[in-house]
Swiss-Prot record:
The organism of origin for this protein: Vibrio alginolyticus
EC number assigned by the record: 3.5.1.105
Residue ranges annotated for the Chitin-binding type-3 domain, each copy included: 333-375, 382-419
PANTHER family in the cross-refs: GLYCOSYL TRANSFERASE-RELATED, POLYSACCHARIDE DEACETYLASE YHEN-RELATED
Protein name per UniProt: Chitin disaccharide deacetylase
Listed GO biological process terms: chitin catabolic process; polysaccharide catabolic process
Lineage per the UniProt record: Bacteria, Pseudomonadati, Pseudomonadota, Gammaproteobacteria, Vibrionales
Gene name per UniProt: deaA
CDD domains on file: ChiA1_BD
Pfam families with a match to the protein in the record: CBM_5_12, Polysacc_deac_1
SMART domains associated with the record: ChtBD3 (SM00495)
Length: 427
């Protein structure tokens, strides 16, 4: 009997050791993100993901539910439900993909009219307040078609967003970036004669930056991408939708891991030029951008026939290579009781990002909060708020006015910008 117990203990110990090795041997985390659904093609994409036991993040535009997105979208509601019921993350990509700025008068045929011109990335953003309101409109329409949508824990469209066209980031106070050549005021970014001055970006880009700041002040995190899985043969005859093969695309992911990929990605309109290279939250992570319409047989090519098998194969190869997959709500790790935190670590708690002030082991009554001495608020918002570690040179907004931070400090309730001339200068 003693021998049996010893044998069992040995086996258990070996199994645990192998498990621990497997846990520490992870190569990196891949975040599969899909833009511009829900459309009919979303269903097949989700089925492949489910078959491969991988969760993804879908940045949805609700105009497809209204049937005005100029896609194969009569099953859009079915796709939305399937994504939610399967546990995938549903995030916000605006109601109409900013097409209201592409045509003179937005209406049911606007998507087709914009597609006919191809001018999506000219004057894409014009009025920051109105453009930002399209994210709130997206929520309203999603909830109209699925009234119980907010009961899904994986419905995150009121917390996580991605701007159309632009590789933009608002993750923490010090983890921000914008696509400074993403859109233009005159020429498409790939047309002859186009030039981009990152020191003085287009009015459209400036408006997009303002939209990102509005979203951040409304509690959103926005994420761009490290790698774009797109056709390498746009513009040729069928099957023009053919994506990069799974093996070389995994090589692209390998090349992006632990590099400053958003600054080197091509083409120029896909870059995030001022991405904070080396930021710790970016370590060991690769965000893959792709689009559901690339996975259907239709007007653009043979996407389902060509690309659905590539998606499955890529997932299989990535797992074999040591990658794991996760969703964007876990990009910034959630605060957990019992975790050991080092000074400088970031967590997400109740919709707010915090940074650890001192090293400690989290306890139930030590949760991050506006009054915590263990954590400071590290949200990407520009609005002044309490318990933020402000640096000299930071610019904040308070009661509609902008202020420059003169002295580094952690904000307190009675140190508002309008009452502390030594800490702030009005702009």
């Amino acid at each position: 009997m003693k021998l049996n117990k010893l044998a069992i203990a040995t086996l258990v110990s070996a199994a645990l050791s192998q498990y621990a090795f497997a846990q520490t041997d992870t190569k990196g985390t891949i975040y599969l993100t899909f833009d511009d659904g829900p459309i009919n093609a979303s269903i097949d994409v989700i089925n492949v993901l489910n078959q491969e036991e991988v969760k993804a993040t879908f940045y949805f535009n609700a105009w497809h539910l209204d049937g005005i997105g100029d896609e194969n979208e009569d099953r859009a509601l079915e796709a939305l439900k399937l994504a939610l019921d399967s546990g995938h993350i549903v995030a916000n990509h605006s109601y109409d993909h900013m097409v209201h700025n592409c045509v003179e008068e937005f209406g049911p045929n606007s998507a087709a009219e914009c597609n006919a011109t191809g001018d999506h990335q000219i004057n894409s953003y014009q009025d920051p307040a109105y453009d930002a309101s399209m994210f709130a409109e997206n929520l309203s329409v999603l909830e109209k078609y699925l009234p119980n949508i907010t009961s899904y824990p994986n419905y995150k469209a009121n917390e996580f967003a991605r701007l159309p066209y632009t590789n933009g980031w608002r993750v923490t106070k010090d983890f921000k970036a914008d696509g400074l050549c993403a859109t233009s005021d005159d020429l498409k970014p790939w047309e002859p004669g186009y030039s981009c001055d990152t020191a003085n970006p287009s009015n459209s880009v400036k408006a997009a930056i303002a939209v990102q700041n509005i979203l951040a002040n409304n509690g959103y995190q926005t994420h761009g991408w490290d790698v774009d899985w797109a056709p390498e043969n746009w513009g040729i005859a069928m099957p023009a939708n053919s994506l990069t093969e799974a093996e070389p695309f995994l090589g692209y992911v390998d090349s992006a891991l632990n590099t400053c990929a958003p600054t080197t990605i091509n083409p120029i309109n896909s870059k995030a030029q001022e991405f904070p290279c080396g930021t710790p939250l970016h370590a060991d992570k690769v965000i893959v951008l792709t689009h559901e319409f690339l996975f259907e047989d239709g007007k653009r090519g043979m996407g389902a026939t060509q690309n659905l098998p590539k998606l499955a194969k890529f997932i299989q190869l990535a797992k074999q290579a040591g990658y794991v997959f996760d969703t964007m709500d876990n990009y910034t790790p959630n605060w957990q009781v019992g975790n050991n935190y080092s000074a400088g670590d970031y967590v997400l708690h109740l919709g707010t990002v915090y940074q650890a002030v001192t090293s400690h082991t989290a306890q139930q009554d030590w949760a991050p909060s506006p009054t915590s001495s263990l954590w400071t608020n590290a949200d990407p918002a520009t609005n002044w708020t309490q318990n933020v570690s402000y640096k000299q040179g930071d610019v904040v907004t308070y009661q509609g006015l902008r202020y420059l931070v003169n002295v580094p400090h952690v904000s307190q309730a009675d140190w508002t910008p309008n009452s502390q001339n030594t800490l702030f200068t009005a702009l």
